[in-house]
Amino acid sequence: MSHNQNQPHRPVPVHVTNAEPNPNPNNLPNFLLSVRLKYVKLGYHYLISNALYILLLPLLAATIANLSSFTINDLSLLYNTLRFHFLSATLATALLISLSTAYFTTRPRRVFLLDFSCYKPDPSLICTRETFMDRSQRVGIFTEDNLAFQQKILERSGLGQKTYFPEALLRVPPNPCMEEARKEAETVMFGAIDAVLEKTGVKPKDIGILVVNCSLFNPTPSLSAMIVNKYKLRGNILSYNLGGMGCSAGLISIDLAKQMLQVQPNSYALVVSTENITLNWYLGNDRSMLLSNCIFRMGGAAVLLSNRSSDRSRSKYQLIHTVRTHKGADDNAFGCVYQREDNNAEETGKIGVSLSKNLMAIAGEALKTNITTLGPLVLPMSEQLLFFATLVARKVFKVKKIKPYIPDFKLAFEHFCIHAGGRAVLDEIEKNLDLSEWHMEPSRMTLNRFGNTSSSSLWYELAYSEAKGRIKRGDRTWQIAFGSGFKCNSAVWKALRTIDPMDEKTNPWIDEIDDFPVQVPRITPITSS
């Protein structure tokens, strides 16, 4: 993988080779052989993107030339004209002021990301692939065939040797109970919140909005109530607890916080994303439910948002867009990730999350719908024109030989944070969006180092890019997440400043970032103990 931190978007010189005699009687080089198509496309992109400036230059030149010919008499005549129309000028000025005031008071409030923090568990909670298989075998519930099935999944998952499991499941025998689940939730959430409050200097009493998402663990009192109690948040806080919304719920929480910040002036919003493993380790033999055991790991993140204009100078990012897609009206999409009791004849009643075989196809449809909505908001005009021209050629003129045009999102974003749901998901998105290994590196390394941490994985990926020193002022980052329902959600962030890795003391990658990226084999054999 490339360590180059600058994207390869600059044109390169055209080289023409004359090794063979040129059959062209005019001695002109065959540019079809010498010009790479992607650079022609890049030049077209630059031309269309700057078309407005090119068109305005002659108008500006003509205006300057006209103004330069103004004399004192011309200015005197203009003054006299305005003086005799004083009332009209006054009304026009008042109207302009009124319209400006209306615009500034009704426009959406800008939402800034002050900082975020990802929880890094204690080294004692590291779960190697061998440890996972050992604990699975010691439980005494899984059949030999299903133990072999889990080992096969794990060997191909892309997970490394330093992912984390909760203490209750590492014990022999394991102790999955409500008390241990609460302990895991508190450890992860409070650890992430402590770090983000310390980094930003924001006091708990200043937080006016709290949004917590955890899909499978929803105790009473809620997780959000646990945070209010721990940090003694104020009594009129707007508190929300989102459950059952899958791995995409982190961006749903961001969108909800954004909506609340539009109507709550001068407020801070704390968003906490996590998942609980302790009570959701499936102890049965339904294979559709065993995949979750193999890839989900312990983790969480806390994000602090603000709509205060004074916070812009110290914020890292500005939230530009959020786009949410819900395919739940389709029965197949609704049931492709489904929590239920297993149907094993020998051991019924074990609850797990079943993943259907058509999950990838459904995720692809959800992604297509999402980017169709997002594209016009972020893509440069050059890409939109190419897409429209291709669509007209295929649909209107019935030119079937032309393939559907996939917009180049690398022209809209410098960084991609794709939910580390599994190797197959990342492979498909890399292929469909034509992304490079460099673009996919944060997602693949997060999957390798931390596993699938559900909704918080996007923040481990952004933290990776920060630790690598990749985030520069003005850079745009696209976060994409998938979740049960079935949902696909996107968030677009713009960096307000260059992130210096040396300032990121609590970044979960910072003490080992030089060890990455690592080569992840397609199959990593697990050595038996």
Swiss-Prot record:
The keyword Repeat does not apply. Pathway: Lipid metabolism; fatty acid biosynthesis. The active site is at residues 247, 326, 415, 419, 452. The chain crosses the membrane at residues 52-72, 84-104. Expressed in aerial organs. Expressed in leaves, flowers, siliques and stems. Expressed in roots, young seedlings, leaves, flowers and siliques. The keyword Membrane applies. It is found in: Membrane. This is 3-ketoacyl-CoA synthase 20. It is a multi-pass membrane protein. Keywords: Acyltransferase, Membrane, Transferase, Transmembrane, Transmembrane helix. Pfam families: ACP_syn_III_C, FAE1_CUT1_RppA. Residues 1-22 are annotated as: Disordered. CDD domains: CHS_like. GO terms for cellular component: membrane. Induction: Repressed by herbicides such as flufenacet and benfuresate. Down-regulated by darkness and low temperature, and up-regulated by drought and osmotic stress. Up-regulated twofold by drought, but no effect of other stress treatments. It catalyses: a very-long-chain acyl-CoA + malonyl-CoA + H(+) = a very-long-chain 3-oxoacyl-CoA + CO2 + CoA. Its EC number is 2.3.1.199. Belongs to the thiolase-like superfamily. Chalcone/stilbene synthases family.
